[in-house]
Regions:
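Short, solvent-exposed secondary-structure boundary/capping segments
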Residues: 128-137
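Short proline/glycine-enriched turn/loop segments at secondary-structure junctions
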Residues: 108-109, 137-139
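Active-site loop/helix belt of alpha/beta enzymes
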Residues: 1-119, 123-127
Length: 139
C-alpha cells in the first residue's frame, strides 16, 4: 500500500540487516497489508505475497532474526488460507461483516457481532441556510 516501511529491494535488505545489528535492537515483526485481497482479481495479492516472501528469505539469509510475520487482513484470512504466517489482523470480519462482495463468503460463515439501533428523538423545521451540527457542517 506504500504507507510505511521499506521498499522491496536489495538496498532495503542491507539497511534492515545493518539496523538489526545495532545494540539493544530486536526485530519483533515484519508485515504487509494485502491491499487488494478483497477484489475478484487476486493477481496483485499473489504478487504482493511473493515480494513479502522474497524479503523474508533475503533477511533470513543475512542473519536477521524476526519473531513474527504477518500479511493477513479480513480478506486474506478468508481467501488466502495458504498464505497465513504467525499473525493475522482481522478487521471488519471481527464484527461479522465481509470485507467486500468479492470474497469467498462460503469459506467462512461470519455472524454479525453487533447491531446498531437508533430512534428518532427530535424533528424540527429550520430555515434554508441555517447552520447545523458541529462547525456548521450542514446548511
Amino acid at each position: 500500500m506504500g504507507r510505511i516501511g521499506f521498499k522491496v529491494s536489495k538496498e532495503s535488505v542491507e539497511t534492515i540487516s545493518r539496523i538489526s545489528k545495532l545494540p539493544n535492537i530486536k526485530m519483533e515483526g515484519m508485515f504487509t497489508h494485502f491491499a487488494k485481497a478483497d477484489e475478484f482479481d487476486k493477481s496483485y495479492t499473489f504478487a504482493q505475497h511473493e515480494k513479502f516472501l522474497w524479503m523474508k528469505e533475503q533477511l533470513e539469509k543475512n542473519g536477521v532474526q524476526i519473531s513474527y510475520y504477518d500479511c493477513d487482513n479480513s480478506a486474506g484470512i478468508i481467501d488466502f488460507p495458504d498464505m497465513k504466517h504467525d499473525l493475522a489482523r482481522a478487521g471488519i470480519s471481527i464484527y461479522g461483516m465481509y470485507p467486500s462482495d468479492e470474497v469467498k463468503k462460503d469459506a467462512v460463515d461470519l455472524k454479525p457481532a453487533l447491531e446498531l439501533i437508533s430512534h428518532i428523538s427530535f424533528v424540527k423545521d429550520v430555515e434554508k441556510g441555517t447552520s447545523i451540527s458541529y462547525g456548521g457542517t450542514f446548511e
